[in-house]
A protein has these predicted regions:
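Bacterial N-terminal signal peptides
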Residues: 1-2
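A generic "folded-domain core" signal
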Residues: 5-181
Length: 181
């Protein structure tokens, strides 16, 4: 161990002890083996830390019963996050999706006529944008195939985003869908 590594380790240990004194070093909510995590008791800092450290290439269901918020997220190897909102808790809200970059900034969402062409591919079969409100029959076929697909790809503006479809059984869980999202 070098002197720099020793100082770094000591600094981390001291920092953790100090933040622990003020209650900032609380344990993060844990994701169960099924891919579900209860975030209702998490602080904003814990939620941000959990989001930054989501397991890669699988669906994770985040539930917050206190606030009535339920999310389904999949983080790619590159750090992009895909949120699918297929089974909306409030049936009047349309199904939608959101794609975030590594910093958590929204890149794409649902049906955005300003965004240009969006294509979803399930195991390399193209479904176009199944969230287009004028193509609802495509959404139904997309949902059926999604349950058994191995890989989800999203193509937009000459960029391909790739997500593994592990824990696909979570896709049937009800989620919070916001209108105009």
């Amino acid at each position: 161990m070098t002197a720099c590594q020793s100082i770094s380790t000591a600094q981390t240990t001291v920092s953790n002890k100090i933040t622990g004194l003020f209650g900032y070093n609380e344990k993060l909510p844990e994701i169960d083996p099924k891919g579900i995590v209860d975030i209702s008791k998490a602080t904003i800092e814990q939620y941000e830390q959990l989001s930054a450290n989501l397991p890669l290439n699988q669906w994770v269901y985040l539930e917050n019963e206190k606030q009535g918020i339920y999310q389904l997220q999949n983080k790619s190897t590159e750090g992009f996050v895909l949120s699918l909102r297929l089974n909306c808790k409030i049936s009047s809200h349309p199904p939608t999706f959101e794609l975030q970059d590594v910093q958590g900034k929204r890149i794409l969402y649902g049906y955005d006529k300003e965004a240009g062409q969006i294509q979803f591919l399930l195991d390399n079969k193209n479904y176009g944008n199944p969230f287009d409100p004028f193509q609802r029959q495509t959404l139904s076929r997309f949902q059926q195939q999604l349950a058994s697909a191995k890989v989800i790809k999203l193509f937009h503006a000459s960029k391909l985003y790739r997500f593994q479809n592990q824990n696909a059984e979570l896709l049937s869980k009800p989620v919070s869908c916001r209108e105009n999202s």
